[in-house]
Amino acid sequence: MSAKKPLALVILDGYGYREDTASNAIANAKTPVMDALIANQPNTLISASGMDVGLPDGQMGNSEVGHTNIGAGRVVYQDLTRITKSILDGEFQQTAALVEAIDTAVKAEKAVHIMGLMSPGGVHSHEDHILAAVEMAAERGAEKIYLHCFLDGRDTPPRSAEGSLQRFQDLFAKLGKGRVASLVGRYYAMDRDNNWDRVQVAYDLLTQAKADFTYDSAVAGLAAAYERGENDEFVKATEIKAEGQESAAMQDGDAVIFMNYRADRARQITRTFVADFAGFERAAFPAVNFVMLTQYAADIPLAIAFPPASLENTYGEWLSKQGQTQLRISETEKYAHVTFFFNGGVETEFAGEERQLVASPKVATYDLQPEMSSTELTEKMVAAIKSGKYDTIICNYPNADMVGHTGVYEAAEKAIEALDASVGQVVEAIKEVGGQLLITADHGNAEMMVDPETGGIHTAHTSLPVPLIYVGDKAVEFKEGGKLSDLAPTMLSLAGLEIPAEMTGQVLVK
């Protein structure tokens, strides 16, 4: 069998394009490799946000959405848009799983607990959805409505939760029942790297009201956290309970509705509510009726309000049907993105698909190791290219995104420089074997490290376009106005393969 000349797609997570060089870690880092590629290779900019990826207009892109669109080869209607629409249409209020959980609790005079990332960020959740859930519980007769707020500060400015908390305090005052019952930073409640000690802090807060601090209002609890030097993301377990109020710890028979729609950071805390769990010793394990807003994992046996819509003939599935071999490779932080999300929410590997996982470094925050595990990832990537085994290789480098999220500018520059060296080695390997390479990103981040409006650090994604660069021996000229969902049809075209009818994206090569 002759050695294959692979077509590789390298996704530089969080690597957007911004003309303004102020606080732009990508523009200011020393990047001889990327500079040379942009000067000498076919390249263009493509859209990775808003309506172009199935998000609301102007909404910044994110990794889940980006990889889903890239892999699908069509614009995929995102959960955020789907759920917002269902609320406006009145469908949300009739959703079977939600109705059943709330009505069962009401009938037994039990509490309805609503938990989720309390933020207008729109990446993992949206506070408008949480508001609709609170109103629905109240309308269906729930008297005890407890809201457990996971605070953001990552997809939103680092200290921006007060407006959201005030909004819910006002809502409960208007309803005359229910309250904000707890606060904790997403660092604890939404870990995705098996740091079970962090998750346990959130679990104990929910199930035992075990907290480091207690305050009589959510806004007061937040102010105290800021006094202690904690930004939203890192707020310690805080119980919100005024004199004479009963504990809001979850009890047998209560309903629990988890209002995050994005799976990767919702899985771990959700698994703590399943009988078969070994992450840590649970001091309390209330028998609650738990509803996931969307399916967080196929093996979690809990009710789902919005089951996944299946995608037929994604890039990975289509390659498999053509008898092609493919490799998916990344670090822990983005492994789910190049596998599960890229495959349209399918956990299992397709025939001919292999996966390689490189462990992300075990550091508290990635500014402490901005190169992350790029050296090892690149070694494996180069070996895969030269192995002659794969028709296609999909690789994600997380650095620009994960270090961009820390808000530490110097570290972001170092991350970009580490990436540049890695890309150089990948380019050399591709040229050596006569393969083809597309370099792109799933959304922006590190190109804006300071918020131009406030002058504060900017830790969130951006709505800016991302690069698309071609390396290979074909005479390629790109069309303008492309988007992420055009990548799969473009890759199939470059590989000389037929494009399935389901892929409505355009081929970006003229």
From Swiss-Prot:
Gene Ontology biological process terms in this record: glucose catabolic process; glycolytic process
Binding, substrate: H124, R154, D155, R186, R192, R262, A263, D264, R265, K334
Cofactor note: Binds 2 manganese ions per subunit.
UniProt GO cellular component terms: cytosol
Active site location: S63
Pfam families found in the cross-reference section: iPGM_N, Metalloenzyme
Residues in coiled coil: none
The reaction(s) this protein catalyses: (2R)-2-phosphoglycerate = (2R)-3-phosphoglycerate
GO molecular-function term, one example from the UniProt record: phosphoglycerate mutase activity
Origin: domain of life: Bacteria
Subunit note: Monomer.
Biological role stated in the UniProt entry: Catalyzes the interconversion of 2-phosphoglycerate and 3-phosphoglycerate.
Protein name, as recorded: 2,3-bisphosphoglycerate-independent phosphoglycerate mutase
Organism whose genome encodes this protein: Vibrio vulnificus (strain YJ016)
Gene: gpmI
